[in-house]
């Protein structure tokens, strides 16, 4: 893959952007920038090649700059770039939902969201609404696990078990219980199949 460095613009002012999960002051002293991507690699403005080991944020699993994806997105944007989902729809959303439920037989309905964090908060609301709808609105307790990550919405950081994600925000959702985490390198570092250690935590 040949990248033209001359086409890359490096910003000379980094102050306007507030980056999530980042020490912004340190970053702006020594910025780490990606300017292009191809396949499973990112490229820095000076042309260095960096393996994308996390597929973006787990959302570029097919690789970067895949021509079929680019062509499909371009074709759709030229026809219909956006349509709201409140009280109105568009044909492809229903077609896509039908294809998904056809692939995963255990599920009969689909709700599209913009991110994992929104998905988690939506799932929590659905769970509460379901219990209220069947006459058991007193069932409001959620169970999470220490060190568990469920996004960065208020619901997700409430049931999640990463305390630094919560410490600056005061009270979260009430009625949350956190079970002990199962991460133990000493017992589970080199285990084939189901680990022998950890079953006792199910008693929590």
Locations of regions flagged by a protein language model:
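Glycine-rich loop-to-alpha-helix module at the N-terminal edge of alpha/beta enzyme cores
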Residues: 6-7, 21, 49-136, 143
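Active-site and channel-lining beta-strand-loop segments
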Residues: 31-52
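Short beta-strand-to-turn element immediately C-terminal to the catalytic PLP-Schiff-base lysine
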Residues: 43, 63, 156-160
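Active-site-adjacent loop/helix segments that line or gate small-molecule/cofactor pockets in enzymes
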Residues: 4-38, 88, 197, 201
């Amino acid at each position: 893959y040949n990248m033209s460095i001359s086409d890359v613009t490096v910003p000379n002012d980094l102050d306007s952007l507030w980056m999530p999960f980042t020490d912004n002051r340190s970053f702006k002293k020594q910025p780490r920038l990606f300017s292009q991507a191809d396949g499973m690699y990112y490229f820095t403005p000076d042309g260095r090649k960096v393996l994308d080991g996390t597929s973006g944020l787990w959302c570029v699993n097919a690789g970067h700059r895949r021509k079929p994806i680019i062509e499909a997105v371009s074709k759709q944007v030229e026809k219909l770039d956006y349509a709201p989902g409140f009280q109105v729809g568009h044909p492809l959303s229903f077609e896509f939902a039908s294809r998904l439920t056809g692939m995963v037989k255990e599920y009969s309905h689909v709700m599209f969201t913009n991110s994992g964090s929104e998905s988690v908060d939506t799932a929590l609301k659905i769970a509460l609404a379901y219990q209220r709808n069947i006459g058991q609105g007193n069932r409001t307790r959620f169970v999470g696990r220490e060190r568990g990550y469920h996004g960065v919405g208020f619901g997700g950081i409430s049931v999640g078990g990463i305390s630094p994600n919560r410490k600056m925000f005061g009270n979260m959702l009430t009625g949350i219980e956190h079970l002990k985490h199962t991460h133990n390198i000493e017992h589970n570092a080199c285990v084939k199949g189901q680990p022998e250690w950890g079953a006792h935590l199910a008693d929590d």
